[in-house]
Amino acid sequence: MFTSIPSLDSVLQCLLPAFTQPSFQTHIEVLLGWVMCLSRRTEYGVFQTIQAGTPVSRKERHPFDRFYNFFSRSAWTVHDLAHQVAVAVVVRLNPRGLLYLVVDDTLLHKRGKHVYGLGWFRDAVASTAKRVATASGNHWVVVGLAICIPGTSKIYCLPIHAMLHRAGKNHKSEAMLAKEMLGDILEWFPDRKLVFLGDGAYSTKN
């Protein structure tokens, strides 16, 4: 089992309110396993890294049940985790003044009939001015906080909220998901003024 360094541990402790104590411990193990994984970072590969000292057959899934259940059954939500991440980032890096938020979407390439939320979406990286490329994957709408790192002139955009965009007319559009996340952030920081930036895809009447 890996042990986090003190500087990382202080960051992880900020996220504790989003978890129960058991799920928080599993969260730490999964995060450290992801950081230390030298192979392809699939769930199985990360879980193997966590238990690197214990050989596990690919036919035996039960040693990793606790880690698989962390994502499907544990008592935590992406919304609550995003809240704690946002608070930690704002308090430490943007405690006063305007909050500059940037929204965009990204495609995480995935295949497989068991992958949740899978769909075919425009691949912005592979597309050109004359050709629109599509690819299979999970399509995420992400809101980041643009900040100037103290002591430098560099501006970075740190993700603080994200929602999965599902393909099809029966699911919410990217703009609607962005609107919901903006509403969340307004609730989290009711005393702050926000500047919300996005491209034409997020310019809608609703």
Residue map of PLM features:
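Conserved, well-structured functional cores that handle cations and Mg-NTP chemistry
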Residues: 1-206
